[in-house]
Amino acid sequence: MKAGRGTLGVCLAKQSQGGDPDKLACGLKKRSQKRNPSPSVVPSWTDQPVADSHGKSRATGAAASEMKHGQSKASLLHHGGFKVLQSLKGSVGRSSAPAASLGKAVALSPAPSEEQLAGMSHGIGDALGSDWPGREPRATDNRGQYLKGESWVSGRPGHPKLREVGFLRGEPPSAGPKGLGTWSELSHRYFELGQLPYAYPYYKVLPEGELRCVSLDRFNPGLSEETVEDEKTLKFFRWSADSRGVTGSAIFQISKSLMP
């Protein structure tokens, strides 16, 4: 610069004083090439930058803004899952948390892992097992499973509905099934069924001459008949449990004498 004027201003001044326009243009081109790098080296997005009021290139500012926005999105994707899980955990931990906040946390959270699902199922099962209205807490082992032999009706001792259908509190009799898929004939009509979950709301009492049975919620009864010595009909009831605390299936055999 000379006297505060740029190269273009100097050339125009010389031309006005009678200088050769071709020589002035050639000199202007050479000076521009010395000050600026080769066009092949300069990226295309920097061609013809427009200076803003602060003297910065708008293209450079746009590139920096885009890079910052990309970093923010990457940070959100990386840490967003952890923050949402923490929010969900806090909402579940507070019994007075609004349902709306929990719904938002669930809607924003990614798909839970198998361990998280197992933990949620375990917590729900414990709550239902111990806080059921009107029941006594049942004993569990160190893994939260109900102890073998713990009666499902222990929280309802002597309930009239259980007595009416013939189910008593306690373990199955010695003549009952010993293992999964095995059975033996029961000589008496009334027997103890210790692993029956809350049958009294679904009881059904038949006439005295008929078999007494119970319709259980969440159970799929399957009935098969077999004639033995033309005197007795054996009916086998198979229940496959899908609720917590009942493992596998139990087959119980109820016998009824057809003799008068």
UniProtKB/Swiss-Prot annotation:
InterPro entries: FAM220A (IPR040355), SIPAR (IPR029155). One of its GO terms (biological process) is negative regulation of transcription by RNA polymerase II. It holds the Pfam family FAM220. It is found in: Nucleus; Cytoplasm; Cytoplasmic vesicle, Secretory vesicle, Acrosome. Residues 1-75, 129-158 are annotated as: Disordered. Keywords: Cytoplasm, Cytoplasmic vesicle, Nucleus. PANTHER family: PROTEIN FAM220A (PTHR31980:SF1). Interacts with transcriptional activator STAT3; the interaction occurs in both the nucleus and the cytoplasm, is enhanced by IL6 and promotes STAT3 dephosphorylation, leading to negative regulation of STAT3 transcriptional activator activity. Can interact with both unphosphorylated and phosphorylated STAT3 but interacts preferentially with phosphorylated STAT3 in the nucleus. Interacts with protein phosphatase PTPN2/TC45; this promotes interaction of PTPN2 with STAT3, leading to dephosphorylation of STAT3 by PTPN2. Promotes dephosphorylation of transcriptional activator STAT3 by interacting with both STAT3 and protein phosphatase PTPN2. This promotes interaction of PTPN2 with STAT3 and mediates STAT3 dephosphorylation by PTPN2, leading to negative regulation of STAT3 transcriptional activator activity. May be required for spermiogenesis or sperm function. This is Protein FAM220A. It comes from Mus musculus. The lineage of its organism: Eukaryota, Metazoa, Chordata, Craniata, Vertebrata.
